[in-house]
A protein has these predicted regions:
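Conserved phosphate/pyrophosphate-binding and hydrolysis machinery centered on Walker-type P-loop NTPases
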Residues: 25-29, 58, 170
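Walker A/P-loop nucleotide-binding motif
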Residues: 45-67
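P-loop NTPase nucleotide-binding core
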Residues: 59, 63-182
Length: 182
């Protein structure tokens, strides 16, 4: 079984793996209970909050994060996983956003990305209506509302490419976005 071999190899090498996190998470029952309660709360209320995990090198922080990723994804939640580094420093939020978006997994998907879900949507579909209403009412800015509406409405491939780039974090000037929105 290839999955079993990958898990054994990850354990042998000490490299954190989502597959390992899926099967070996029972060693921390209190933390797992807290994570489970928090995920249930997010599922029920639609609101999330923060949770700080700290520890020394080799104490299993990444293993725990992989386990949480699997739990949330298994609970039909949108999840994203990224590592902060020199290439993705916390003080450069546009880089964090790009990495976050490129590592976003939709429920039931094994590969990251969300544009494939948008491509089949029209502005009049029920899901699009929910997304647009949320973007218009719940966010601090209306930019995402206009981006989504334009992306779903345009037939022009160049406009679609620019809107896609903006959604993925390669931001387009607001003047150009206004021109596309018409």
């Amino acid at each position: 079984d290839m999955e079993a071999r990958r898990i054994l190899e990850a354990l042998r090498s000490g490299i954190p793996s989502r597959a390992v996190g899926q099967y070996f998470s029972e060693a921390r029952p209190q933390i797992m209970k807290e994570v489970s309660v928090r995920l249930d709360r997010v599922s029920e209320t639609g609101k999330s909050d923060g949770f700080v995990i700290s520890g020394k090198y080799g104490e299993g922080k990444t293993h725990l994060l992989n386990t949480v990723f699997n739990m949330a994804h298994g609970a039909n939640m949108v999840v994203s996983y990224l590592s902060l580094s020199k290439e993705t420093p916390m003080d450069k939020l546009y880089l964090v956003y790009q990495k976050l978006v490129s590592n976003t997994y939709l429920p039931g998907r094994q590969q990251p990305g969300f544009l494939q879900a948008l491509d089949g949507m029209t502005p009049n579909s029920p899901l699009a209506g929910e997304m647009l209403a949320y973007a218009a009412k719940e966010l601090d800015t209306d930019k995402l509302y206009y981006l989504l509406r334009s992306y779903m409405s345009t037939e022009d491939q160049e406009e679609r490419f620019l809107l896609q780039a903006d959604l993925e974090g390669d931001f387009v000037a607001n003047g150009l976005l206004k021109k596309i929105y018409k």
